Amino acid sequence: MENYKDKHQEIRQGVRALCGQFSAEYHRKVDAEKGYPEEFVEALTKEGWMSALIPEDYGGSGLSLTEATVIMEEINRAGGNSGACHGQMYNMNTLVRFGSKEQRERYLPKIATGELRLQSMGVTEPTTGTDTTKIKTKAERKGDRYIINGQKVWISRVQHSDLMILLARTTPLEDVSKKSDGLSIFLVDIKSAMDSGMAVRPIQNMVNHETNELFFENLEIPSENLIGEEGKGFKYILTGLNAERILIAAECIGDGYWFTDKVTSYVNEREVFGLSLIHI
């Protein structure tokens, strides 16, 4: 039977080599300053790790979600925090699978090179939590645009992303036979949105990356930014959410390895009464 770790050894070694360029002091300093590891994320992007899920035709590596979990696991095993950038992995999955040919051609090459970042997803709302079908943010079609009104909360990495995937209801809940119908997803240009109807209020509780409340007041989004079919967004967004859970699980495994390595090293090196702890 093929060994899982051997199969991905090249990826593991490559990620470890890059992470080795950033000391523990670097990450501690960023965390102490409640900053963002910009240099670290840029290095991951330059080496192609952040474009792992982008097809080769668009400048990426064309890898699968399995390989993406290996990348996230190794970042955390090396003492980094992939929470600063993992959003690009699971958001990318949604755009690659359901974006139009025009959307993929327009955005994926620029995301692959790092010219653009897609690290943010706007789903959660103050009164709905994980009951996604009951979101209140609305998108009303008017001509060649959608008008967005509503509120989101716990939306991470807005300050470090150029694009955001936004879930909104395009058909009122009372007008659909199935509550998961009538939801749509859009690709939002964050900078443009902040100048024309989207307000961002940071929540001061996160280390390594900001999370925020978002307020939408008559934000206009071009209809061409609709991803997939109108009303089918619930199915599309699950692709990203499911990938997110898998990636975070891999990160936790990496954390477990890191802590185990640290404890093992400590009990071997720490001496008490002339013996290392492991021999007491």
PLM features per residue range, with description:
Residues 114-123, 167:
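A short, Trp-centered hydrophobic/proline-enriched beta-strand micro-motif
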Residues 144-145, 149-197:
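A short core secondary-structure module
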Residues 2-7, 77, 197-278:
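Glycine-rich beta->alpha junctions and the first turn(s) of the following alpha-helix
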Residues 137-140:
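A structural signal for short hydrophobic beta-strand segments in well-ordered beta-sheet cores
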Residues 83-102, 129:
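N-terminal glycine-rich flavin-associated loop
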Residues 48, 71-76, 167-170, 187-193, ...:
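Short Ser/Thr-interspersed hydrophobic loop/turn segments at strand-loop and sheet-helix junctions
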Residues 1-86, 106, 110:
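Amphipathic, small/basic residue-rich leader segments at the start of a protein or domain
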Residues 62-74, 131-135, 215, 221:
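Structural signature of FAD isoalloxazine-binding scaffolds in flavoprotein oxidoreductases
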